[in-house]
Regions:
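Glycine-rich phosphate-binding loops of nucleotide-dependent enzymes
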Residues: 2-244
Length: 244
């Protein structure tokens, strides 16, 4: 059996005396898309931040076989983790092209791929990122991640939140292409997107792991989906932007 690329065990986070995570277990396979699911407030974003060392944490976070608890965020990310945060993380004072160049990759076929996935970025190369729509900024954030040849894992935190349906579709295609090269940990509440992309899922509830298994099985199980995720019908609806 292939060992997971990312193996999280008993991850706990306490912030300001408040217990946010009570012991999360999470595996991300060495290929494909793993979805991290849960209702609002379940601890999904805090789990990602804990994995990246952005918040104080205890437990074990093994990445590529190495323990990363005790490392700084810079040390962790330098080991090959691409991060698309919920707030998109673009540099608003830089142009689109300058944001993409932060990936430190010389022009090569990867730029062609980004422009193929997001034609608007080529058209708006000289435009300041701060003047872009939220959807266009998300394209920049994902495009920058795709251009970083050092990434061995991509973590995307609710990448379709609040986006128009057309942009949701473009983001889905981009994540599919990314997953052909590196594993993806996808935090998402758009269950149609999860159904399309993810082979495996982990569900959090109240800061703990409540379920782990094949995504298709969970999303086809009406009762379990309703209990864990709060959906009252089969979770195979058409993807919509802002479906949160």
């Amino acid at each position: 059996v292939t060992s997971p690329l990312l193996c999280v065990r008993d991850l706990k986070v306490v912030i300001g005396g408040r217990h946010i995570l009570h012991g999360v277990d999470l595996d991300v396979a060495a290929g494909g898309v793993t979805a991290l699911l849960g209702r609002n407030g379940a601890g999904k974003t805090t789990t990602v931040r804990g994995v990246l060392g952005l918040v104080p944490r205890t437990g074990s976070v093994r990445y590529g076989g190495d323990e990363t608890v005790g490392m700084t965020t810079h040390q962790i990310v330098r080991r090959g983790i691409g991060y698309v945060p919920e707030d998109r993380g673009v540099f608003v004072a830089l142009t689109v092209a300058e944001n993409l160049r932060l990936a430190e990759r010389d022009p090569d076929p990867a730029y062609d791929l980004v422009h193929e996935l997001f034609p608007e970025l080529k058209q708006r190369a000289r435009q300041q990122a701060g003047t872009l729509s939220g959807g266009q900024q998300q394209m920049v954030a994902i495009g920058r991640t795709l251009l970083n040849r050092g990434n061995r894992l991509v973590i995307a935190d609710e990448p379709t939140k609040g986006l128009a349906p057309r942009v949701v579709t473009e983001v889905a295609v981009a994540l599919e292409r990314a997953a052909q090269a590196v594993p993806v940990l996808l935090v998402e509440q758009n269950l149609a997107l999860v159904r399309r992309l993810a082979a495996h899922c982990v569900v959090l509830a109240d800061g703990r792991t409540a379920h782990a298994g094949p995504a298709a099985e969970l999303l086809a199980d009406t009762e379990k989906s309703k209990t864990l995720l709060g959906v009252g019908r089969r979770a195979d609806v058409t993807a919509r932007g802002g479906d949160h």
